[in-house]
């Protein structure tokens, strides 16, 4: 079989679509391309199974629609796989309708939006299959191998049989992640994602996932809890083996482990000690997502010794009421303590905040602004990111707000973080965006600038700060 895994180009006056490997979609004024781990794994699985594979990211490759279409249809695919998210699903419906006029290929949709609402896309466009859940790479391999025999389909597949839409039931996350191959980086054009990424201080960089996806998996706003309601990990030694290959074969200098939360406990200890034993800590830097409240100062010290550079935490708000409503299982005081410990251990700390909660007003937002700026001024946070609260379909937050009449619209185009879609009776949209800008301006505080200056060690740092300044300007533009 001939299988194309694609991201059609998206021309928009709003900016560049940040679609791949992204839990929250945004249009960016400055291009940012994130390596898509699961799609790349799917491509590798299919190639190893003997199929011909085209991996075509029209966004990251910056192809024109004409160039993209020409390359895709010259490949003559039997299957075309498209990952979608809520803010662009209507664009993908239109693209699929046009694609079906040009080719007899079966079109497959994947992603968190169609996992939450599979019936919708089956009704709104002539898509042939929808693969639900986060293990769609395994499902795609099964689908192609089944060659149209629905009796062989695994759970989680939606399909058409004559004029009837059918499905194989709820998806199951029972695949062994150690059975997934190491990604064929050449097949998926890894270099497209190696530099235009604000997280990387050193380049070239790339991504892996040691786990799928987060061991908490209860945050009510997170779209990936729809894909991954449970948690599994790869073998720690196998992960180190892959990292060693990436360093030796591709010269990778920085690695982002984009598991929703990096595995902790014995897994983390084994991983760090093996990285140190092989001397990989002297050859690359490692970034990861983490949650507050699980690691001690000694854990951060071990991570730093193992070559970790950046740890990303989701804070979302400095108001305990909001953290509790989001089921963050987090206390505000844990944030300060965790940031201080990580910084003291020599790690850079990146924080994410969200604004535009239905129950927060100017006073609560000001509290979060003060908190974020304090962490920057103390040097306990190196970087941070602010976004609007977007309740994605399938999340508990979406269900809560929809039931309470708390949504401005169900027009998915509007869920792109350009404006608030949540009704905020206690704060205007202008006040919300002003709060976000106040946080970003916290980077320009004298104490924050001083910490940045005193932490400068190499030319890589200077290049990173320059890219960071451009990102800061871009964020101020994005939320003006």
Language-model regions: role of each:
Residues 120-123, 299, 359-374:
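Catalytic cores of alpha/beta
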Residues 100-105, 126, 148, 276-283, ...:
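Short helix-capping segments at alpha-helix termini
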Residues 3-31:
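Short glycine-rich His-centered loop
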Residues 55-59, 83, 226, 353-355, ...:
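Residue-level recognition of beta-strand->loop/alpha-helix junctions
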Residues 178, 183-350, 357, 367-370:
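Radical SAM [4Fe-4S] cluster-binding motif and immediate context
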Residues 2-5, 69, 196, 395-398, ...:
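Radical SAM enzyme core and accessory elements
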Residues 38-173, 394:
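Glycine-rich beta-alpha loop elements in corrinoid/cobalamin-binding modules
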Residues 13-16, 118, 265-266, 321, ...:
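Flexible glycine/acidic-rich beta-alpha junction loops that bind and position SAM and/or redox cofactors
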């Amino acid at each position: 079989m001939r299988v194309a895994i694609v991201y059609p180009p998206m021309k928009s006056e709003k900016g560049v679509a940040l679609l791949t490997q992204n839990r929250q979609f945004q249009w960016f004024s400055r291009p940012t391309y994130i390596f898509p781990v699961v799609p790349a794994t799917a491509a590798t699985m299919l190639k190893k199974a003997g199929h011909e594979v085209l991996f075509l990211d029209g966004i990251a490759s910056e192809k024109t629609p004409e160039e993209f279409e020409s390359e895709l249809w010259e490949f003559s695919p039997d299957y075309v796989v498209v990952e979608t998210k809520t803010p662009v699903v209507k664009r993908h419906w239109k693209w699929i309708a046009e694609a079906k006029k040009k080719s007899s290929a079966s079109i497959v949709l994947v992603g968190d939006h169609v996992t939450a609402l599979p019936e919708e896309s089956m009704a709104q466009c002539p898509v042939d299959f929808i693969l639900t859940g986060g293990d769609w790479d395994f499902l795609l391999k099964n689908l192609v191998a089944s060659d149209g025999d629905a009796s062989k389909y695994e759970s989680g597949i939606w399909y058409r049989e004559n004029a009837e839409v059918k499905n194989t039931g709820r998806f199951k996350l029972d695949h062994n992640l150690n059975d997934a191959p190491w990604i064929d980086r050449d097949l998926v054009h890894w270099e497209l994602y190696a530099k235009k990424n604000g997280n990387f201080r050193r380049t070239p960089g790339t991504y892996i996932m040691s786990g799928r996806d987060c061991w908490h998996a209860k945050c009510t706003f997170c779209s990936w809890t729809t894909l991954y309601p449970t948690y599994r990990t790869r073998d720690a030694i196998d992960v180190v083996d892959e990292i060693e290959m990436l360093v030796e074969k591709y010269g990778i200098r920085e690695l982002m482990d984009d598991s929703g939360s990096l595995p902790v406990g014995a897994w983390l200890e084994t991983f760090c000690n093996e990285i140190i034993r092989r001397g990989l800590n002297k050859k690359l830097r490692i970034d990861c997502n983490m949650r507050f409240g699980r690691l001690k100062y000694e854990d951060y010290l071990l991570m730093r010794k193992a070559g970790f550079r950046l740890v990303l935490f989701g804070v979302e708000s400095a108001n305990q009421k909001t953290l509790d409503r989001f089921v963050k299982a987090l206390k505000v005081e844990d944030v300060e303590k965790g940031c201080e410990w990580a910084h003291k251990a020599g790690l850079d700390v990146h924080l994410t905040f969200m604004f535009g909660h239905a129950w927060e007003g100017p006073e609560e937002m000001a509290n979060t602004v003060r908190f974020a700026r304090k962490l920057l001024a103390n040097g306990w946070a190196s970087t941070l990111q602010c976004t609007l609260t977007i309740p994605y379909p399938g999340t508990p937050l979406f269900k809560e707000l929809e039931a309470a009449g708390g949504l401005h619209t169900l027009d998915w185009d509007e869920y792109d973080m350009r404006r608030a879609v949540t009704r905020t009776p206690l704060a205007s949209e202008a006040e919300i965006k002003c709060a976000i800008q106040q946080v970003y301006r916290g980077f320009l505080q004298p104490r924050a600038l001083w910490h940045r200056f005193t932490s400068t060690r190499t030319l890589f740092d200077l290049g990173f700060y320059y890219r960071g300044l451009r990102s800061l300007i871009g964020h101020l533009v994005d939320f003006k």
